[in-house]
Design a protein with these regions (language model features):
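C-terminal binding/interaction regions
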Residues: 1-22, 68-118
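Short beta-strand scaffold segments in enzyme catalytic cores
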Residues: 26-35
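Compact, glycine-rich, soluble single-domain proteins
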Residues: 45-59
Length: 118
C-alpha cells in the first residue's frame, strides 16, 4: 500500500474513534476497513455494562461491511490513544483471520504505525 492510502485509512479510523461508546473503560478505539472495491467501512468500540457483550472497533467495521454484502478486503486500520501502535485483541484476530484481511495497520494518535501482513 502507498503511504497516502495508509494515512487515509488511519485518518478514517481516527474519525471512527470519535464515535466510541466507552463509558466504563474510557478507552476509545477506531477502525477503518478498506474493501477490494475501494469502499471504506468505519467502526468504533461499543461497550456494555456486561463486558462480554462489548464489541470492538475492528469487529464493528468488519460486521458492517459483511452485512452490506462485502466479502473481499484489502486492509484494516485500528487506532487508539496508546503508547505504541494498537494491536487487535484475540477475538478480533480470529474474525480478521476468518475474513482473510491481508493487511493490518496498527496505529496510535501520536502518528506511529506498523503494517503487518497476514
Amino acid at each position: 500500500m502507498k503511504e497516502k492510502d495508509i494515512q487515509k485509512l488511519i485518518d478514517r479510523a481516527i474519525v471512527a474513534r470519535d464515535k466510541t461508546y466507552s463509558p466504563y473503560s474510557h478507552f476509545g478505539v477506531g477502525a477503518a476497513l478498506l474493501c477490494e472495491d475501494g469502499t471504506i467501512y468505519e467502526g468504533c468500540n461499543i461497550e456494555n455494562a456486561s463486558y462480554g457483550l462489548t464489541n470492538c472497533a475492528e469487529r464493528t467495521a468488519i460486521f458492517k461491511a459483511v452485512s452490506e454484502g462485502q466479502t473481499k478486503f484489502k486492509a484494516l486500520a485500528v487506532v487508539a490513544d496508546t503508547e505504541g501502535p494498537c494491536a487487535p485483541c484475540g477475538a478480533c484476530r480470529q474474525v480478521i483471520s476468518e475474513f482473510e484481511i491481508p493487511r493490518i495497520i496498527m496505529a496510535n494518535l501520536r502518528g506511529d504505525y506498523t503494517v503487518v501482513e497476514l
